[in-house]
Amino acid sequence: MQYATGQAGRIIAARLFEGEDVYECIESIAEKENIKCASVLITGGFRKADVVVGPESEEPKIVPKFMHFAGPGEVLGVGTLYNDEKGPKLHLHAAIGKNGESLVGCPRGGAKTFLILEVTIIEITGIDAARKFNKEKGLNLLDIK
C-alpha cells in the first residue's frame, strides 16, 4: 500500500452543457487551474458513453471489456484527477441509469453530457502523486510517493 496525507485546497464547481465531452472538460479545468491531484464528483445526465465493466482478460495485460450506454440517462459518479506524463487524467467510476436499468463502471470513449452535468472538483494539496505507466499491466496506475 502507498498513501500520503494532504489537505483540501480549492473547490471548483462547474456545469457542463449538452453534448460536451466529460473527460475533455474536466481535464481542461485541471490544466487551466494547474490542479495536479483532486477528487471529482459528478451528477446529472449522460447522452452516451462506452463503459468499462471489468476486464475481458487479465493476461498477459489487462484488456478492458466495454459496454455501450445509449442515453439519455442519469449519472452519479466519483473519481480522481492525477497527472501522467501528458497532464491531468481523470479516472471516473459511475452509475448510469435509464428506464429502470443501470450500468456501473468506468465511462470512457466519448462520454457526452445530456442536458447538464454538475461537477465538483476538490483539489488535494501537500501530496506527491502521479499516474505512471505499468508495463506489466499495460495501464497508467497511481503512484504515491
Where are these regions (language model features)?
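N-terminal intrinsically disordered, cationic/polar leader segments
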Residues: 1-90, 95-145
